Amino acid sequence: MFHILIGALLGLLFLATGTRAQFQFFEQMFGGGGHQQQQDHREQNVASDSSWYQRNYDNAHCSDYLCPGTLACVSVPHHCPCQHPDVEDKFELGDGSAICISKGGFKANEAARKVELARKGLL
């Protein structure tokens, strides 16, 4: 009788442990319950104001020109790189300034050609 009782208790314990493990799996998969654990590993978002940018700008050392968009240190303003070079082309204007324009799926140098046409009033 004692062996049957021990066997039954062990069986119940085994089932309860398996059920608990299953629920923990589903909680983690579908975002339920385990929020506290996830928050510990999640990076914090940057501030919604300009304090993060201002702090980095103030701490950047540059003896020449500090580009406001990328915080790159260059010799003259029109040498500033584009913020997103994978999707932007840099076009230097004749007055010593430069602009970054979206590549927009155009073929190579097509964006620069369109800027020139627009400056001439042809576009």
UniProtKB/Swiss-Prot annotation:
Probable component of the endoplasmic reticulum-associated degradation (ERAD) pathway. The keyword Signal applies. CDD domains: LCL2-like. This is Long chronological lifespan protein 2. The keyword Signal applies. Belongs to the LCL2 family. Keywords: Signal. One of its GO terms (biological process) is ERAD pathway. Residues 1-21 form the signal peptide. Coiled coil: none annotated. InterPro entries: LCL2. It comes from the Eukaryota.
